[in-house]
Amino acid sequence: MFSVFGLSIPISATELLLASATFCLVFWVVRAWQPRVPKGLKSPPGPWSWPLIGHVLTLGKSPHLALSRLSQRYGDVLQIRIGCTPVLVLSGLDTIRQALVRQGDDFKGRPDLYSFTLVADGQSMTFNPDSGPVWAARRRLAQNALKSFSIASDPASSSSCYLEEHVSKESEYLIGKFQELMAGSGRFDPYRYVVVSVANVICAMCFGRRYDHESQVLLSVVGLSNEFGAVAASGNPADFIPILRYLPNTALDDFKDLNRRFYIFMQKMLKEHYKTFEKGRIRDITDSLIEHCQGKRLDENANIQLSDEKIVNVVMDLFGAGFDTVTTAISWSLMYLVTSPSVQKKIQEELDTVIGSARQPRLSDRPRLPYLEAFILETFRHSSFLPFTIPHSTTRDTSLNGFYIPKGRCVFVNQWQINHDQKLWDDPSAFWPERFLTADGTINKALSEKVILFGLGKRKCIGETIARWEVFLFLAILLQQVEFRVTPGVKVDMTPVYGLTMKHAHCEHFQAHMRS
């Protein structure tokens, strides 16, 4: 028995020695597990965490808000744990630009998360951990294919490019559909129709054809995308707590099945293209990729080929880049229009002055419609419906703001925090498109570049430019002809629901009135 501070403790010398040895072993393991920090650098700060689960409870149902609050206490570079996995969290515009742009090679990796291996058979450019020359070459090819079939023009069309042609047709369909619904029930939920039209645009770009809106092919694509968003929104704890992969997990099983079905669908579309492919007559993005596969190198300085089985993965990435983001952006835009009728009126006055009613808006009108552009920027900023980028990881040992970051560290980039940072924005909680306009009514370019929604640097969304064009065209054409309202007395719920893309509650009380 030992006496400590006058208290008798019933413990033998052997037990005390064993307890001391256990403590020393645990202490040594913990110290060995932590990376050695080079002299002159520090480890990122962060809050105390629970054993095994880490900061899961701290993150709660709104991780973007929880991590924004933590950044106010610990700074722009902080570290948390999800399960037993350390995660670096970046906030602040300057810090994120430093990491993703100036030190882009250090932060261009993707973490080797289990859920990422389930997307596109583990070969997705977007989710794959590979960041070497093969990945870079495929990314360039995908960007070029997407761009060429967006800005290229159809000789038989009066539109300036394929994207303009497809969006114009879908916008006209939506206007007609909204009037049909108004003649019936007098109200509707625009999301269910917008999502199908946006899917039809990307189908036309990727597969060379638009579908009837009741087509089972088109509706199955929409259904798969909606399922992906719903399942991804719940997150995959198995990414950070590996033992969960081997326990009953309905959400994970659903995610596996969803990706399998989407992969099978894309393979079917690719097989149909191979049957009808004619060299020299390129109809769409898939044909363009097949042509490269059959004889062109992706990189003239390296022997890098695009195999047949990889084409389906590239098409899946492009489809994802051009679908959910655009749908969500338009959906949020419509919500802001009905909750800010004075803003909608200003946009329509600008359209009337610049374009009139004799013709449809075109992409070339974009520089002459600054208020509409300011509205889109404010929608992106205020909603921040992509609160985080897809997680990054470090490709080598590096440092940031004086903190040591080891190779392979998972990195969360908090875009929501930037878009609501009081250091950057006056009254960030207010929806105010005018903040982006200069005294002479033009777009404040420096301020517009502070809105971060599509990521930055080498992993920036490949569909960003096309997404911005598409959102602009849909809104310009719709607002030229239609005034949106909600049923009198109905309060619109703008509360965002956290997910891969944050959605608002569906509103079934929209009304669309034709403008005179």
Swiss-Prot record:
Residues 33-44 are annotated as: Mitochondrial targeting signal. Pfam families: p450. Disulfide bonds: none annotated. Keywords: Cytoplasm, Endoplasmic reticulum, Glycoprotein, Heme, Iron, Lipid biosynthesis, Lipid metabolism, Lyase, Membrane, Metal-binding, Microsome, Mitochondrion, Mitochondrion inner membrane, Monooxygenase, Oxidoreductase, Steroid biosynthesis. It is a peripheral membrane protein. Gene3D superfamilies: Cytochrome P450. Substrate binds at F228. Pathway: Steroid hormone biosynthesis; Lipid metabolism; fatty acid metabolism; Cofactor metabolism; retinol metabolism. GO terms for molecular function: estrogen 16-alpha-hydroxylase activity; estrogen 2-hydroxylase activity; heme binding; Hsp70 protein binding; Hsp90 protein binding; hydroperoxy icosatetraenoate dehydratase activity; iron ion binding; steroid 17-alpha-monooxygenase activity. The keyword Membrane applies. One of its GO terms (cellular component) is endoplasmic reticulum membrane. Heme binds at C461. This is Cytochrome P450 1A1. One of its GO terms (biological process) is fatty acid metabolic process. Signal peptide: none annotated. The keyword Oxidoreductase applies. It catalyses: an organic molecule + reduced [NADPH--hemoprotein reductase] + O2 = an alcohol + oxidized [NADPH--hemoprotein reductase] + H2O + H(+); estrone + reduced [NADPH--hemoprotein reductase] + O2 = 2-hydroxyestrone + oxidized [NADPH--hemoprotein reductase] + H2O + H(+); estrone + reduced [NADPH--hemoprotein reductase] + O2 = 4-hydroxyestrone + oxidized [NADPH--hemoprotein reductase] + H2O + H(+); estrone + reduced [NADPH--hemoprotein reductase] + O2 = 6alpha-hydroxyestrone + oxidized [NADPH--hemoprotein reductase] + H2O + H(+). SUPFAM superfamilies: Cytochrome P450. Its cofactor is heme. Its EC number is 1.14.14.1, 4.2.1.152. It is found in: Endoplasmic reticulum membrane; Mitochondrion inner membrane; Microsome membrane; Cytoplasm. A cytochrome P450 monooxygenase involved in the metabolism of various endogenous substrates, including fatty acids, steroid hormones and vitamins. Mechanistically, uses molecular oxygen inserting one oxygen atom into a substrate, and reducing the second into a water molecule, with two electrons provided by NADPH via cytochrome P450 reductase (CPR; NADPH-ferrihemoprotein reductase). Catalyzes the hydroxylation of carbon-hydrogen bonds. InterPro entries: Cyt_P450, Cyt_P450_CS, Cyt_P450_E_grp-I, Cyt_P450_E_grp-I_CYP1, Cyt_P450_sf. Interacts with cytosolic chaperones HSP70 and HSP90; this interaction is required for initial targeting to mitochondria. Interacts (via mitochondrial targeting signal) with TOMM40 (via N-terminus); this interaction is required for translocation across the mitochondrial outer membrane.
